[in-house]
Amino acid sequence: MGVKIGELIEDKVELELSDIAGKKIALDAFNAMYQFLAKVRQPDGTPLMTSKGEITSVHSGIFYRTANFLKEGIIPIYVFDGEKPSFKSRAIEERVRAREEAELKWKEALEIGDLEEARKYAQAALNITGDIVEDCKTILKLMGVPIVQAPSEGEAQAAHMAMKGDVWATASQDYDSLLFGAPRLIRNLTITGKRKLPGKEVYVDINPELIELESVLKRNGISREQLIMIGILVGTDYNLGGVKGIGVKRALELVKKYKRPEDLFSKVPWEFDVDPISIYEFFLNPPTTDDYDTSLKRPMSDELLKFMVEEHEFSEERVKKVINEIEESYRMLSGGGLESWF
């Protein structure tokens, strides 16, 4: 879901993948996996599956998209969520409810043969299971791509790594990374290409875009702390929907009038079970770890081929071709080329 602060962000720089060649990018793994689950589908919205009915849309996205990053000279570091904060339970419940409703509408659309509607609802109907997560970690490890296990929110950990300078930017479709302090956020990194507009036979080009935290703060005349307060007012994953009657523009006015969170939240009708100061403090000081390695490793090609082809029924010819490209990318990136870029 993420925080809805897009109205505050005007300075977006469109990127080509070549613009970030040589950079290490920390990706919100779950955000990327849900993008792949939504995008890699058959015409009726059904995800890719093995003959046993095991979903492989996410496997496909992780494998082929990550290989393309490496080919472009980009080192992706996938950051996986850890334990959710206790006050995120409502957001999780809401997602489960929305998935159940979408699944019902998907099946209804299939029954009447409305493939357009079926595909739309299918994108929201499926979940990332624990088995899919473990499979994706295995694929990345066999590719030699770094993975990081966050103690809590993946975006918080990615932002921490960016603030330390261990990665150049974070990557996610959500803006939460900015509230967690990421100096740079790249959106659309995992969905670059053409995307169909909802309900229309129209396709638009989607390119990565760079957002810099300092530019956002300077343009709006606020601090990061005030940005966090705006996020809480309009709604985060921890207080869905935000404070009634307050949109982004009104929130901006309020944080400029009441600069301390204690003053601000005492002036608005707060109707959530969670204390707003707890959310504020979580964004400022989330649990993170320094126990990670961002270096690219040599791919385990034989094991990767077996895992993709024998266990998950991918095309042997195509997988072999991509593995050869991964091996070449590793030689390029580990042979001194990366240091000259990063």
From Swiss-Prot:
Protein name: Flap endonuclease 1
Positions of the UniProt region annotated as I-domain: 117-259
Key words of the record: DNA damage, DNA repair, DNA replication, Endonuclease, Exonuclease, Hydrolase, Magnesium, Metal-binding, Nuclease
Listed GO biological process terms: DNA repair; DNA replication, removal of RNA primer
Family the UniProt entry places it in: Belongs to the XPG/RAD2 endonuclease family. FEN1 subfamily.
Pfam family, one: XPG_N
Single GO molecular function: DNA binding
Highest taxon in the source lineage: Archaea
Gene3D superfamilies reported in the protein's UniProt record: 5' to 3' exonuclease, C-terminal subdomain, 5'-nuclease
Enzyme Commission number(s): 3.1.-.-
Keyword Calcium applies: no
